[in-house]
């Protein structure tokens, strides 16, 4: 007998969440309600049989630009940013555990007793066994964003797509906040993004994805059900890939 349940379009994904997404309506830090909602949405994916790798930014806890302008060394600022992503990772791991989802937190910098150090083979093995793996501390190197970390880990774990959860519905022709006439792209290729100078990710992250033909889907993480819709192959957000037919 054929199953009537629709199957997910992806088997293994890398989900990138901005630190700001965790703030919700708070001016700073982590909004517990948002954290729990995201944990529930991730739980839905796990229950559908999707293998989930997760990278979270740190902008809700630490922003290096202001301190850099005041003279702080960029490397020091980036190290602080990496630790902010570990704090977000700890919060997310805890939220997932409270939602009865098995999750493991890995860090690109060694933090004995707090979380595991990043190990590629172990990450693959955990994903295969249905655990959510949270990759924190970025790439472990300064001058690289968490978007670069998301693309790097996505390539390493052979994710089929990087899903970038943002505060807007996808990639627009212009800033939708300042220009209400900006149009939302449904499907666009890497070269068009570069040519039109659309802000999706920093160049290092974006070219890494392009060079490895890793598709990126940008969607609104604050829209309930959007993540599931993406996983089920619906036209949610913007798909960036090699060909945009």
UniProtKB/Swiss-Prot annotation:
GO MF entry, a single one: UMP kinase activity
A GO cellular component annotation in the UniProt record: cytosol
EC number, UniProt record: 2.7.4.22
Key words, A-Z: ATP-binding, Cytoplasm, Kinase, Nucleotide-binding, Pyrimidine biosynthesis, Transferase
Known regulation of activity: Inhibited by UTP.
Localization: Cytoplasm
Binding locations of UMP: 58, 78, 139-146
SUPFAM superfamilies recorded: Carbamate kinase-like
Catalysed reactions listed for this entry: UMP + ATP = UDP + ADP
Amino acids binding ATP: 16-19, 59, 63, 166, 172, 175
Alphabetized Gene3D superfamilies for the sequence: Acetylglutamate kinase-like
Recorded family membership: Belongs to the UMP kinase family.
Role description: Catalyzes the reversible phosphorylation of UMP to UDP.
Listed name of the protein: Uridylate kinase
Name of the gene this protein is made from: pyrH
């Amino acid at each position: 007998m054929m199953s009537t349940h629709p199957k997910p379009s992806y088997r293994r994904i890398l989900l990138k969440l901005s630190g700001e997404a965790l703030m919700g309506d708070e001016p700073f830090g982590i909004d517990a309600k948002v954290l729990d909602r995201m944990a529930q949405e991730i739980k839905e994916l796990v229950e559908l049989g999707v293998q989930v790798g997760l990278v979270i930014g740190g902008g809700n806890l630490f922003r290096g630009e202001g301190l850099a302008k005041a003279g702080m060394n960029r490397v020091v600022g980036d190290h602080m940013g990496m630790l902010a992503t570990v704090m977000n990772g700890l919060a997310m791991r805890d939220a997932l555990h409270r939602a009865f989802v098995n999750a493991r937190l890995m860090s690109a910098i060694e933090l004995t007793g707090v979380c595991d150090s990043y190990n590629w083979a172990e990450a693959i093995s955990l994903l295969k066994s249905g655990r959510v793996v949270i990759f924190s501390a970025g790439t472990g190197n300064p001058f690289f964003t968490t978007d670069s970390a998301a693309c790097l880990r996505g390539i390493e774990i052979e994710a089929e797509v990087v899903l970038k959860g943002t505060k807007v519905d996808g990639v627009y022709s212009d800033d939708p906040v300042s220009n209400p006439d900006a149009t939302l792209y449904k499907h666009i290729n890497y070269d068009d993004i570069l040519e039109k100078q659309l802000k999706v990710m920093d160049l290092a992250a974006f070219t890494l994805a392009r060079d490895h033909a890793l598709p990126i889907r940008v969607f609104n993480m604050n829209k309930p059900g959007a993540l599931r819709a993406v996983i089920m192959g619906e036209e949610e957000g913007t798909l960036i890939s090699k060909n945009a037919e």
